[in-house]
């Protein structure tokens, strides 16, 4: 990162602003649903750059029937014989939907290229076709936002170390993650080449500096909200009805049901 390193965002400031932004995300969601809009948000970046944590905060208060996450596994043997973009197309949103890609078709420009999972010819074909593919999405009316989460090598190393020592997050660390440490510069070159070919005027890349996770989350969400032309949709007027009087119903005896043990009482 260039320039003086910014101070970390205090927790109380972060939580207050995050809640405000999440409230706006709900308004964005209701606009998407009301207008029949289609929104695609691409999250890319190195391992441990903060993509997943940001996605979690984006979707925390959203309706999963409107906003969903697409995190595709490695392609099957059948998918490997298809047009490269084909398996991503089926995850694109219909009217009134938001799709967040936790990694995306840009796998071919990054991990597949660096790790040798695709040929040089396939990689170059991707770089040529990707802008065309994205322009097709835009011409069809899809709103597309692409974010690259940029983490320093020192911060990535520290996050890997914490994952290694944390039994709750240990599953996040894979042999591929560890391999990325020794291929840092190869990934850097791949990222630079990707940006040269795919940072197009119609669908630019937005870089999120992410050594400070709180700052990265706030900055990314605020930018998304600022670049989508949504407006507040008045919610329907709802009133709670009065509960009707009992008609004599009685619950069956408790011993006829199997209840989970009260583990909390033992704490």
Identify the function of each model-found stretch.
Residues 1-267:
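Glycine-rich phosphate-binding loop of ATP-dependent small-molecule kinases
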């Amino acid at each position: 990162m260039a320039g003086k390193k910014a101070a970390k965002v205090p927790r109380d400031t972060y939580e207050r602003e995050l809640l405000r932004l999440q409230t706006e995300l709900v308004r964005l969601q209701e606009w998407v649903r009301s207008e029949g809009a289609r929104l695609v948000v691409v999250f890319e970046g190195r391992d441990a750059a903060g993509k997943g944590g940001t996605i979690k905060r984006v979707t925390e208060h959203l309706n999963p029937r409107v906003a969903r996450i697409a995190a595709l596994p490695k392609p099957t043997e059948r998918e490997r014989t298809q047009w490269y973009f084909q398996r991503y197309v089926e995850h694109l949103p219909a009217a009134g939907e938001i799709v967040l890609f936790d990694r995306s078709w840009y796998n071919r420009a990054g991990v597949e290229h660096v790790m040798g999972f695709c040929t040089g010819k396939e990689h170059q074909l991707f770089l040529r076709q990707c802008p065309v593919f994205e322009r097709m999405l835009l011409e069809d009316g899809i709103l597309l936002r692409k974010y690259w989460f940029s983490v320093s090598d020192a911060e990535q190393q520290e996050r890997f170390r914490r994952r290694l020592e944390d039994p709750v997050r240990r599953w996040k660390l894979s042999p591929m993650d560890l391999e990325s440490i020794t291929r840092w510069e190869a990934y850097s070159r791949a990222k630079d080449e990707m940006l040269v070919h795919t940072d197009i005027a119609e669908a630019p890349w937005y870089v999120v500096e992410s050594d400070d996770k709180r700052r990265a989350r706030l900055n990314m969400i605020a930018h998304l909200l600022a670049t989508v032309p949504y407006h507040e949709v008045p919610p329907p007027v709802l009133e709670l009805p009065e509960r009707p009087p009992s008609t004599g119903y009685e619950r069956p005896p408790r011993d006829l049901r199997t209840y989970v043990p009260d583990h909390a009482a033992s704490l």
